[in-house]
Amino acid sequence: MKARLRFNKMGSMMYIGHLDLMRYFQKLFRRCGLDVSYSKGFNPHQIMSFASPLGLGLTSIGEYLDLSLESFDYNGFDSEKSGKASYTADEWIDIINANSNGLVNVTGFRIMPDDIKPSMSLLSAATYRVEFEQTDIPGQIYDFFNENDELIYTKETKKSKKDIDLKANIPVIETSYELFAREMSSCAVFDYEYEKQYINDD
């Protein structure tokens, strides 16, 4: 049984890297009693994968996690929960969030078809929001982006150098002074389109 979870990663959890976040979920699911499938072999581990590892220092309101489940049954040590044969997806969301730290919250839980592709291969892009203390910076970035046909970045490795056109990978950039008014700061918004199939709950 395959499941797809959508979750937020906020606050000080921005300083937790991808591997530590994976370990966090492994312990969280064990604590919740979620009946997760394990790999076979000498060192079995929970079968899960992320759509796109989030960079260190970033928060997110829309991360995706693919998970293999044996069942929707409770598989833990709480005798009261063990009395119920199975839980719904919404009930599991409540159970997971109740056992989380308040900075990582599951906002969506859906059972997927067995032949569904991993979310990593379905996700085509993401939306980033950048905030600035100086209100004139977003406008400068917007003008610079639109005035140049290319934005070349030279990526250097130990063996070679490679020029990459950053603009080709940023379909839209816009500034907003109203959308995030509660933040009391202006920002630059990098808009992308998500792959619609099975990615969003909408």
Pin down the residues of each PLM region:
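A generic structural signal for short beta-strands and their flanking turns/coil linkers
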Residues: M1, C32, P44-Q46, I61-L65, ...
